[in-house]
């Protein structure tokens, strides 16, 4: 070794130089991994957001029709005396009613029994003219005329019955979102007083898709 060459310089010259293009390849791999992760998150988000009426709280339901989605609202009936009735009109969010001409194909009611449930209830959904009230006499007549399906849900020895949903088809009626304020959920407490903390009703309104703003996941 030449005395003029320092030991440090000699060690530096023996260091392995990086191959040409390795830095750019590494950067590309990192970018690809980041893009893959973003796509996985996006796919997961889209999978969650796909419309379906398959809820875990009821049995035998179906997916939404092509081009349709659904909006859910929750109703909690008040205390209902034995042999008495309760009714409440459907009230969808403003973000949905802004598209009042979008067609509605089906209404689905799901009964979610709470731990204290030990009663028998009849549940239905009916079109009620805006001029009509929801008095006990009016609701009683609607349950008896046979013009809409009625779900009879009751406490059983095993706890609660498996079938806890009612599907009301509006396809032939050409109903739209604007018509939903004319529909009401009706409840009849048959055998005893229904307490406030016995059931919750989930109402799924299946309607044509409406424009919504979505953001990519971060």
From Swiss-Prot:
Keywords: Acetylation, Capsid protein, Ribonucleoprotein, RNA-binding, T=3 icosahedral capsid protein, Viral nucleoprotein, Virion. It is found in: Virion. Signal peptide: none annotated. One of its GO terms (molecular function) is RNA binding. SUPFAM superfamilies: Positive stranded ssRNA viruses. Its main location: virion. GO terms for cellular component: ribonucleoprotein complex; T=3 icosahedral viral capsid; viral nucleocapsid. It comes from the Viruses. Residues 1-30 are annotated as: Disordered. The modification N-acetylmethionine is found at residue 1. Residues 12-22 have a biased composition (Basic residues). Capsid protein. Probably binds RNA and plays a role in packaging. Belongs to the cucumovirus capsid protein family. The N-terminal arginine-rich stretch does not seem to be the major RNA-binding region that allows formation of an infectious ribonucleoprotein complex. This is Capsid protein.
């Amino acid at each position: 070794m030449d005395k003029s060459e320092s030991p440090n310089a000699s060690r530096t010259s023996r260091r392995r130089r990086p191959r040409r293009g390795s830095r750019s390849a590494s950067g590309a791999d990192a970018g690809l991994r980041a893009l893959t992760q973003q796509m996985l998150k996006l796919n997961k988000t889209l999978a969650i957001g796909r419309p379906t009426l398959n809820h875990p709280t009821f049995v035998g339901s179906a997916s939404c029709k092509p081009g349709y989605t659904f909006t859910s609202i929750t109703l909690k009936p008040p205390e209902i005396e034995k042999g008495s009735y309760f009714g409440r009109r459907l009230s969808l969010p403003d973000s949905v009613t802004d598209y009042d001409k979008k067609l509605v194909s089906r209404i689905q009611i799901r009964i979610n029994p709470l731990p204290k449930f030990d009663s028998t209830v009849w549940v239905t959904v009916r079109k009620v003219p805006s001029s009509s009230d929801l008095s006990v006499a009016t609701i009683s007549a609607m349950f008896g005329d046979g013009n809409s399906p009625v779900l009879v849900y009751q406490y059983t020895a095993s706890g609660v019955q498996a079938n806890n949903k009612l599907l009301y088809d509006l396809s032939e009626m050409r109903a739209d979102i604007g018509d939903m304020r004319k529909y009401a959920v009706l409840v009849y407490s048959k055998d005893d007083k229904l307490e406030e903390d016995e059931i919750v009703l989930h109402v799924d309104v299946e309607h044509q898709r409406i424009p919504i703003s979505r953001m990519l996941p971060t």
